[in-house]
Amino acid sequence: MAGAKEIRNKIGSVKNTQKITGAMEMVAASKMRRAQERMSASRPYAETMRKVIGHIAQGNLEYKHPYLMEREVKRVGYIVVSTDRGLCGGLNINLFKAALNDMKQWSAKGAKVDLALIGNKASSFFERHGAKVQAHVAGLGDNPSVNDLIGSVKVMLKAYDNGEIDRLYLVYNKFVNTMVQQPRVDQLLPLPVTEDSKLAKKHHWDYIYEPDPKQLLDTLLIRYVESQVYQGVVENLASEQAARMVAMQAATDNAGNLINDLQLVYNKARQASITQELTEIVSGAAAV
């Protein structure tokens, strides 16, 4: 059994760690609330943009934008949104598993895969696995803007325009609540058929375009992709802070349990030490 002094040092070390994880839990909780506010503010725009684009896709257009047209899939692109830092439980690894499962399905069909990565964790993971990375951005901080993402988005859109990729997906963690973050692999291009799109087709909704459909769609569809990627980033940020808060709370609780266990061991060691001292005193007295 370890000595009482050694155990006391361990208890002090665990208490210091507990203070750190407790502080990180409070910081994560504060950041999560701010991230939720940004996420909630941008969600209506992203969802409305998706609906409008879905209605447009089902309209009777003379001009068919390339982003609305299906084509043979030979190469698939993924924009993967991860965190820059760890200490957030299995958030990143669960996301990467979902992405890899989807990539394997396309690889089984003979399609190649290109990646644009957001966040250091995605970069280190996929580069370690030998993936073909076309773009990478990191260090977005706690308040990312669309301008921070445009570079990576443009790389993938240019590849799509040039026929270098035939389908584009967004991979991110969707924030459901504090305890649940859902890995998502959403198709961006060509525009997927959704329930809203089916409803639009059923009711034959249409739009009048000014000045002309081509000019409007060329701009609107790019904004659509940018808005979906930005929404994915802020959803992932809220998910990160929620996962970190839960992970640090668990670490703090575990530290408390460990301190209690060590305290019992310390008490036993102290008791054994006192018993030995008394035994030695009694033995010495008996010898006299």
From Swiss-Prot:
GO biological process: proton motive force-driven plasma membrane ATP synthesis
Keywords (A to Z) from UniProt: ATP synthesis, Cell inner membrane, Cell membrane, CF(1), Hydrogen ion transport, Ion transport, Membrane, Transport
GO MF term list: ATP binding; proton-transporting ATP synthase activity, rotational mechanism
Compartments (UniProt record): Cell inner membrane
Domain of life the protein comes from: Bacteria
GO cellular component, one term: proton-transporting ATP synthase complex
Gene3D superfamilies listed in its UniProt record: 3.40.1380.10, ATP synthase, gamma subunit, helix hairpin domain
Record-linked Pfam families: ATP-synt (PF00231)
Entry membrane topology: Peripheral membrane protein
Family: Belongs to the ATPase gamma chain family.
PANTHER family xrefs: ATP SYNTHASE GAMMA CHAIN, ATP SYNTHASE SUBUNIT GAMMA, MITOCHONDRIAL
Its job: Produces ATP from ADP in the presence of a proton gradient across the membrane. The gamma chain is believed to be important in regulating ATPase activity and the flow of protons through the CF(0) complex.
Subunit structure: F-type ATPases have 2 components, CF(1) - the catalytic core - and CF(0) - the membrane proton channel. CF(1) has five subunits: alpha(3), beta(3), gamma(1), delta(1), epsilon(1). CF(0) has three main subunits: a, b and c.
Protein name as catalogued: ATP synthase gamma chain
Organism for this UniProt entry: Aeromonas salmonicida (strain A449)
